[in-house]
């Protein structure tokens, strides 16, 4: 995707999961360019890195955002933690800045708007970006698995944190 002139940095946020990864591309805090979930069934690490490299090539982000899995509250399995490291290395190799935020940081940012859990954060994101409303999973009961589409909302949350907590010179190309 060719990049139209804008003073806002383009941010690619990735949220790996056991099924693949959710992603969101934002240009500034109010312009959602693309979003989705990429599923990987075999050779998940290699396939995920290939799909992420394709997103980087297509959208040419100035910043890549991932979860800071080292912080309290992260429950990532070893494979996903290793994948996050590999994603960060891929971005650095392509001279893209890498930022990471804990889920707690995202929760704190959205608590100002009254959102206190992942579902309420997703609702707040869908309100901010109505184009995501159709992808909003229904409320999850304790015995239910998390809907794969939640990766989209987690990614948008990470990207918005990048704009909220980073100084402009740290996210500009």
What are these model-derived regions, one by one?
Residues 1-173:
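Phosphate- and other anionic-substrate recognition elements at nucleic-acid/protein interfaces
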